[in-house]
Amino acid sequence: MDAEFESIMKEIVQAIAEAGYDPYAQLYGYVTKGKEEFITRKGNAREKIKKLNWLKVKQYVENWK
């Protein structure tokens, strides 16, 4: 995965954590259910993730653990 994608994902993960949620659980819910509500609006994370390639986000989550 490219550096820009990794940087954006780090920002999204940080925003989810700052909102008080488990980033892995929220991202897993996003990729399995396809619902953007799993991603917080904090830090503009929801808008950022919508601009990313869904398959890359899915791979990111699959490689998390």
Describe every region a protein language model picked out.
Residues 1-65:
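Intrinsically disordered, low-complexity, basic-enriched segments
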